Amino acid sequence: MELNWKKTWMVLGLILVLGFGMRVYHLGNNAFVADEFLDMNSAYGYFKTGEWKAWDFNSGQSSQVNINEARDERANIYKWQVAELFRVLPPTEATARSVSVFWGVVSMLVVFWSTLVFTKRKEVALIATFLFAVSVAGIIFDRRLRMYAMFFPAYLAFATTV
């Protein structure tokens, strides 16, 4: 039985809702870990000052001694998105990580498209998308404040088109 496009879009929509729900569920319950602190400091510093400087939350100002200066300019496109989100939402763990959740949903769409390009089968593309949507590694990847959640769909889309 071959799926028509209407059913395909409906199933894909359900998979996207499921994947989004699994990524956003209790998103702000855990404190930042490892490099998430550095990205939050940099994004918040840009939000407050318009410059790529780490923010010192203890003193409430940009860091005077910026030992991570070179790192503050990494992944500016990603951290700019986080900083822009702070204009409309409070600067919390959930708000900052929601940029990665967004890119996780984009990743699901790119997985569907890429699989469809290579296999020409909607069923296989839906299965691949579902497996990525419920994958523990994919969920963890898309719940961290890290630029890699944005890079994954970009690289997969590029690799598919080349």
Language model feature labels by segment:
Residues 2-162:
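Membrane-integral, polyisoprenol-dependent glycosyltransferases
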